[in-house]
Structures are given as structure tokens and as C-alpha cells.
């Protein structure tokens, strides 16, 4: 966070963040034998703006992010490398409602635009021209979860020097859970990719489309284990219901430390 302030009845927070990622995919041939691997090392830098209406709780998040990709596809005695840039812009809003003292329902709406541009590359077999691709997404859903006070109490340790720090039983830890079902619509998906060899007439162009609708379910749990340390886990599943057939799973573990 770079700035936190109050403006016209609203809480404003803005800042920057960085991230590094690595993915590795094993590729199989038609007969199930190993064909090779695809790896992607990525570094991201982004900025965010968060606005919260003090009286109603209505909030909005604006995010812009750029990512540098370094990709490598490897097979027996053959390597293919490509570098490029990805970008993402997101606008998300939500309005929380209290169902009970510690249970909250929050309708959410999000718009995302993302794109990817990779350099052309080649290996011993031929060449690939990736071109530029982009897609837009609208997500509508809600978040249902607990809204317990996450303040870290003094605990019940018999040793005074440990109260408020290390000696808290599991039942004393501040914990919140949540589930988030959503419908995601992808549209304006575009991007061509062509490949071929040195032989005349070998060039082929593919125009994959990601347009369609999918259902997404996310669930998570977070617990404050120290005054300044929060642990969290999250898992999700997405399945397309129209357009191209696809499904996916995701999982995430987080460690937040404040100082």
C-alpha cells in the first residue's frame, strides 16, 4: 500500500504489487507416450485502487497488470523458445449485506480484459507465429461467508509471557470461511496462430475462440495464527456450459504478514 486516505465519505487505498510464477505442462502423444514439456516463467508488476463507501460498505477494485513471459517447449533433441508480454485490466465491485451478526452475503460483479502477445519462434521442425490475442470476461456471482472479528485475543495460556502470542488453542484462533459461486461470460475472444515448415504451402492458421459461458465455484478459509500472521487456503472448480468444452481446478495457499 502506498496511500490510504478518506475522501468524501469513502476510504481510498492505492498501491503496487509484484508477482513471479512458474508453470510446467507435460505433453503426451496420441498413443499416450511422452511428447515433451512446456514451461512458462513469468514476472508481473501491477497497480491497484480500492474504494470503499464508509456508510454502505459498497466497494470497487481497479487493477492493472503487466506480465513478462518466457516460454520453452522441449522434446527429444529439440527446443522451442518464445518471449512476450501479457496484460490485464479489471474492475470489480460488491455490496455486503449482514444476514446475521457473523454471516454475510455479498453480490459481486466483475469485468476483466486481458491480452497476450508472444514473439514468433522456430525449432528444427518449423516455425510458429503467435500474433496477438485478447478476451473479455464478465463475472456475476455472490460471496457467502462468516464475518467474525479477526482481532487476536489474549488466549488462555497458563504462562503469562505467552498470552496474546504463541499459546492459542485451535478453537481460540480467529477464523473466517467463505464460498463464492459465479457465472462467467467470455466474449470478444480473438487471436490467430499460424505454423508451418520450410516446404511451400505448409502454413496452417488456427483461430481458437474462448467465447462461451462457464460456472465457477470457489471456497476458502483463513485463520489468524499470530497478531500479525494470517494463513489461508482456497480451492475452486470451473466448468464450461456453452462454447468450447473445458474444465479446470485450482488451489492456493497464502501467508500474510503485516509489519
Q: Locations of the language-model features?
A:
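Sec/Tat-exported extracytoplasmic proteins
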Residues: 95, 115-117, 148
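Internal active-site segments that recognize and position negatively charged phosphoryl groups
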Residues: 108-114
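Outer membrane beta-barrel translocator domains of Type V secretion systems
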Residues: 1-108, 119, 236-257
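Outer membrane beta-barrel transmembrane domains
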Residues: 43-46, 131-259
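Extracellular/periplasm-exposed beta-strand and loop segments of Gram-negative cell-envelope proteins
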Residues: 23-40, 68-87, 114-142, 187-198, ...
Amino acid at each position: 500500500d502506498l496511500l490510504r486516505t478518506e475522501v468524501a465519505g469513502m476510504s481510498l487505498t492505492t498501491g503496487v504489487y509484484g508477482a513471479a510464477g512458474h508453470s510446467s505442462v507435460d505433453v503426451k502423444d496420441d498413443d499416450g507416450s511422452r511428447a515433451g514439456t512446456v514451461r512458462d516463467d513469468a514476472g508481473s508488476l501491477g497497480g491497484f485502487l480500492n474504494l470503499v463507501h464508509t456508510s454502505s460498505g459498497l466497494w470497487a477494485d481497479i487493477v492493472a497488470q503487466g506480465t513478462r513471459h518466457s516460454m520453452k517447449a522441449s522434446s527429444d533433441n529439440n527446443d522451442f523458445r518464445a518471449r512476450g508480454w501479457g496484460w490485464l485490466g479489471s474492475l470489480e465491485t460488491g455490496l455486503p449485506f449482514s444476514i446475521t451478526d457473523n454471516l454475510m452475503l455479498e453480490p459481486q460483479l466483475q469485468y476483466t480484459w486481458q491480452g497476450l502477445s508472444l514473439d514468433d519462434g522456430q525449432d528444427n521442425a518449423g516455425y510458429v507465429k503467435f500474433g496477438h490475442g485478447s478476451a473479455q470476461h464478465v463475472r456475476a456471482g455472490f460471496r457467502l461467508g462468516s464475518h467474525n472479528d479477526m482481532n487476536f485475543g489474549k488466549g488462555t495460556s497458563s504462562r503469562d509471557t505467552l498470552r496474546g502470542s504463541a499459546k492459542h488453542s485451535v478453537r481460540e484462533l480467529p477464523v473466517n470461511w467463505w464460498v463464492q459461486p459465479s457465472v462467467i461470460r467470455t466474449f470478444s475472444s480473438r487471436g490467430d496462430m499460424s505454423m508451418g515448415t520450410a516446404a511451400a504451402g505448409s502454413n496452417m492458421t488456427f483461430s481458437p475462440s474462448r467465447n462461451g459461458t462457464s460456472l465457477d465455484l470457489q471456497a476458502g478459509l483463513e485463520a489468524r495464527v499470530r497478531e500479525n500472521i494470517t494463513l489461508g487456503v482456497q480451492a475452486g472448480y470451473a466448468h464450461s456450459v456453452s462454447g468450447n468444452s473445458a474444465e479446470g481446478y485450482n488451489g492456493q495457499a497464502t501467508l500474510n504478514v503485516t509489519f
